[in-house]
C-alpha cells in the first residue's frame, strides 16, 4: 500500500497536500482499494466555503457510495473535472491524477489535527 511521507492524512482515508494556503485533497490508496472500481465522483460544492468534517461530495463505486468529508475548513476553488469522464483515475493514481478538490485554507491551526504518514499507517494497520 502506498502512503507518501510528504502528505497528511485523515481517519476518513483522505490525503491532504499543503502548498501555502492552498490544499489539495483526495482519497488514499487504502480507500480506493476498499471502495473497488470507482465509477463516479460528484462534487457540487465548488466555490462554497465549508467547515471541517462537512461533506463536500460523494464517490460512487460499483459496490457502494461514500461521502467525502472536508479534512480542514476552506473554500473549494477547484474540482478535478477530468474525473467526470475518467473516475477510474482515483483507482489508478489516487495521489496524482486522481486528486479531487483544491481549497483555500480558512484556518491553518486545523492542519495540526491531520495525521502523519506513520500515524495513518497505524490507522490502516500497515
UniProtKB/Swiss-Prot annotation:
Signal sequence, renumbered to the chain: none
Gene behind the chain: gcvH
Cofactor note: Binds 1 lipoyl cofactor covalently.
PANTHER family, sorted: GLYCINE CLEAVAGE SYSTEM H PROTEIN, GLYCINE CLEAVAGE SYSTEM H PROTEIN-RELATED
HAMAP family assigned to the protein according to its UniProt record, in alphabetical order: GcvH (MF_00272)
Matches recorded under InterPro entries: 2-oxoA_DH_lipoyl-BS, Biotin_lipoyl, GCV_H, GCV_H/Fam206, GCV_H_sub, Single_hybrid_motif
Assigned keywords, A-Z: Lipoyl
GO term, biological process aspect, one: glycine decarboxylation via glycine cleavage system
GO cellular component: cytosol; glycine cleavage complex
Subunit note: The glycine cleavage system is composed of four proteins: P, T, L and H.
Family: Belongs to the GcvH family.
Names of required cofactors: (R)-lipoate
Task performed by this protein: The glycine cleavage system catalyzes the degradation of glycine. The H protein shuttles the methylamine group of glycine from the P protein to the T protein.
Highest taxon of source: Bacteria
S-S pairs: none
Protein name stated in the entry: Glycine cleavage system H protein
Positions of modified residues (N6-lipoyllysine): 63
Amino acid at each position: 500500500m502506498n502512503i507518501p511521507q510528504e502528505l497528511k492524512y485523515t481517519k476518513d482515508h483522505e490525503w491532504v497536500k499543503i502548498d501555502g494556503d492552498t490544499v489539495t485533497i483526495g482519497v488514499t490508496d487504502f480507500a480506493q482499494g476498499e471502495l473497488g472500481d470507482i465509477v463516479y465522483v460528484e462534487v457540487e460544492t465548488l466555490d462554497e466555503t465549508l467547515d471541517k468534517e462537512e461533506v463536500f461530495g460523494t464517490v460512487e463505486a460499483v459496490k457502494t457510495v461514500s461521502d467525502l468529508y472536508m479534512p480542514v475548513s476552506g473554500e473549494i476553488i477547484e474540482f478535478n473535472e477530468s474525473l467526470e469522464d475518467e473516475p477510474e483515475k482515483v483507482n489508478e493514481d489516487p495521489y496524482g491524477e486522481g486528486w479531487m478538490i483544491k481549497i483555500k485554507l480558512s484556518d491553518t491551526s486545523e492542519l495540526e489535527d491531520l495525521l502523519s504518514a506513520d500515524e495513518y499507517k497505524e490507522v490502516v494497520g500497515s
